Amino acid sequence: MTKLSGQELHAELSRRAFLSYTAAVGALGLCGTSLLAQGARAEGLANGEVMSGCHWGVFKARVENGRAVAFEPWDKDPAPSHQLPGVLDSIYSPTRIKYPMVRREFLEKGVNADRSTRGNGDFVRVTWDEALDLVARELKRVQESYGPTGTFGGSYGWKSPGRLHNCQVLMRRALNLAGGFVNSSGDYSTAAAQIIMPHVMGTLEVYEQQTAWPVVVENTDLMVFWAADPMKTNEIGWVIPDHGAYAGMKALKEKGTRVICINPVRTETADYFGADVVSPRPQTDVALMLGMAHTLYSEDLHDKDFLENCTTGFDLFAAYLTGESDGTPKTAEWAAEICGLPAEQIRELARSFVAGRTMLAAGWSIQRMHHGEQAHWMLVTLASMIGQIGLPGGGFGLSYHYSNGGSPTSDGPALGGISDGGKAVEGAAWLSESGATSIPCARVVDMLLNPGGEFQFNGATATYPDVKLAYWAGGNPFAHHQDRNRMLKAWEKLETFIVQDFQWTATARHADIVLPATTSYERNDIESVGDYSNRAILAMKKVVDPLYEARSDYDIFAALAERLGKGAEFTEGRDEMGWISSFYEAAVKQAEFKNVAMPSFEDFWSEGIVEFPITEGANFVRYADFREDPLFNPLGTPSGLIEIYSKNIEKMGYDDCPAHPTWMEPAERLGGAGAKYPLHVVASHPKSRLHSQLNGTSLRDLYAVAGHEPCLINPADAAARGIADGDVLRVFNDRGQILVGAKVSDAVMPGAIQIYEGGWYDPLDPSEEGTLDKYGDVNVLSLDVGTSKLAQGNCGQTILADVEKYAGAPVTVTVFDTPKGA
């Protein structure tokens, strides 16, 4: 069996991606436009079929008379996404941004415009030259008046796949050339875990390859999906998904492996496997794990050899577990009082985890909570007590639910992309810290409200910059950030807000300047297939010509860089196909070292895809080498071992993140002291969109209830409030109020309601503070505080609220129509 560690695999892929880019720059020189004459289309297809890809998979587009009429899944996709019709619809959706637009008051008064009127939809159409000149003037003004810390270019969001038209990298490239900017680090998905895990495991863990699915199928006796719904969430990928996880799950089901799903909602995954469903109160997972750990310890079921050889600090944690250090034993009975499960069920769960080979596959929602750092730290501690980390089919995994983690890695090369020109950072693009300074991404509102204020982050003290201008491309913060009404007040601190997108999201509607970008189906690009499998490299060929006056992200930023006097530095003399071919040729050079054959660029572009063989990747066992010899294969932690107790965190002295996994009361929870509202809001990932992407398409017809975002409510909670299926409901707390449509179902536990995150914010009266959101943006209700001083992640799952039948005047949802004048 291959002894390749997750760190080695991740580091090699990241290193190779960086080398791909640098080698391409050195080897190819200026490719210019010659490649366009060698098979690349400068224009969209008039009639016929063309292959391309998206966050939902590889597809073949059928074009008739210059219009895309169908997106059919690739015939080698084992589990095509049901969302492809919505992807097609996004090109022609009424939400398309057609022309460059400027908020009327900003056009007339500039930075003296009333900022509280943002979002009222009063825009004026301008020419591209007028829009780009205005953007360039604003960037220069802020740079000259405030320096690089006056411009925020963090621009977090899922954008679109493609190694050239990566709008966030391109934006950072332009802003770096313009003199610098304030960036953001981390992400909204895994902020707490990606800070705590390097202290515990020596790696981010959340974006690492998992033990391969074939190994899991062969060896795992019990699969536990803890706060994870991989049957739903693996439809999408950060790059182009291969959907390889579905083959693994199908094989696991066919084998009859026992599956447990721990979740307040009966998930699609639970239904698929016929799984046992365990539903603790939301936000009490750490208490449940502690009760299980106490059972293992008190019944002498823990693996003492693994703890002694592969971990450090268990004795200090055990003192807390038994109550020796604080007087409170974390027994199953203690846990039962907090999480609402019977004590005997907690004990039986613990015993079942050590009865055979067990894989703990955890999702990320349990760390998007107040004190979220504790959840995955405690999960690793529980897995360490079970003692199967590094064994085939055992241990834990934090990305089986994300981008098809566990899909076996191929022998192919890593594909590089365009650089932002700043500090070279290995790994995912959103983890970059290039720029004049950087803040944790979820603290953007704190930054705007507290310029010059100090904050703690991962052992360091930092100061919030005084930002005057924000530029957002490929993201929708008015969907993914918490506490919408607090955010709206903070946004008034900005003198200028620029948005570049292809659809009129709530974020675009609150902009001063709006630039229309193409969809990725109106330009050429190149991308990998399979975040973890690296199964293939795909030519993302242009399907149709750009609609209206939309321009590609590369062309927009190149034109902007030209106005800033940095055009040559931005383009380096390359056009679209020159860059794309350079990325491919760098991958070819890398493949030569691996004895992997690849066709010429011209043949590749003609064929549309090059696939790679899978050999050793099918046998990958995460942490096998570490388990075999921790001394010669140490982790990246200070001790080289799994740090159940972290001396580094101890030195930080944080009162909200102790040195070992600890149960800490969140700011609000069901059953918690002083809980003001009776229902927990489970803000789950949506089934038929990617966060907020595709909410403005025809896919909404699949799930909207009475024209609103659906709200799953238990029959008991519905009956107590006189609520019936299909009713329009008002969900409210002290932070805001939203309308949703009722779906009465026992799939959600009593005391909880489920509302998908990513619904587009649609204020009834944008000028009124705390106004009703007409459609159903769950982040109107969520709490905007950091998870702790350590990670400063978001707490998007820390929400208590109440619900009632809506008794107000009928409303019309307008967020899916274009603003007036647009």
From Swiss-Prot:
It catalyses: dimethyl sulfide + a menaquinone + H2O = dimethyl sulfoxide + a menaquinol; trimethylamine + 2 Fe(III)-[cytochrome c] + H2O = trimethylamine N-oxide + 2 Fe(II)-[cytochrome c] + 3 H(+). Binds 1 molybdenum-bis(molybdopterin guanine dinucleotide) (Mo-bis-MGD) cofactor per subunit. One of its GO terms (biological process) is anaerobic respiration. It holds the Pfam family Molybdopterin_N. Residues 1-42 form the signal peptide. GO terms for cellular component: outer membrane-bounded periplasmic space. Its EC number is 1.7.2.3, 1.8.5.3. It is an enzyme of class 1 (oxidoreductase). Its cofactor is Mo-bis(molybdopterin guanine dinucleotide). Gene3D superfamilies: 2.40.40.20, 3.40.50.740, Dimethylsulfoxide Reductase, domain 2, Dimethylsulfoxide Reductase, domain 3. InterPro entries: Asp_de-COase-like_dom_sf, BisC, CT_DMSOR/BSOR/TMAOR, Molybdopterin_N, MoPterin_dinucl-bd_dom, Mopterin_OxRdtase, Mopterin_OxRdtase_prok_CS, Prok_Mopterin_Oxidored. It comes from the Bacteria. It is found in: Periplasm. Mo-bis(molybdopterin guanine dinucleotide) binds at residues 158-160, 189, 232-233, 262-263, 283-285, 364-365, 368, 476, 480, 500-501, 523, 553, 683-686, 689, 691-693, 779, 796-797. GO terms for molecular function: electron transfer activity; molybdenum ion binding; molybdopterin cofactor binding; trimethylamine-N-oxide reductase (cytochrome c) activity. Disruption phenotype: Disruption of dmsA results in the inability to use DMSO or TMAO as the terminal electron acceptor in anaerobic respiration and in greatly diminished in vitro DMSOR activity. Predicted to be exported by the Tat system. The position of the signal peptide cleavage has been experimentally proven. Belongs to the prokaryotic molybdopterin-containing oxidoreductase family. This is Dimethyl sulfoxide/trimethylamine N-oxide reductase. It comes from Cereibacter sphaeroides. The gene is dmsA.
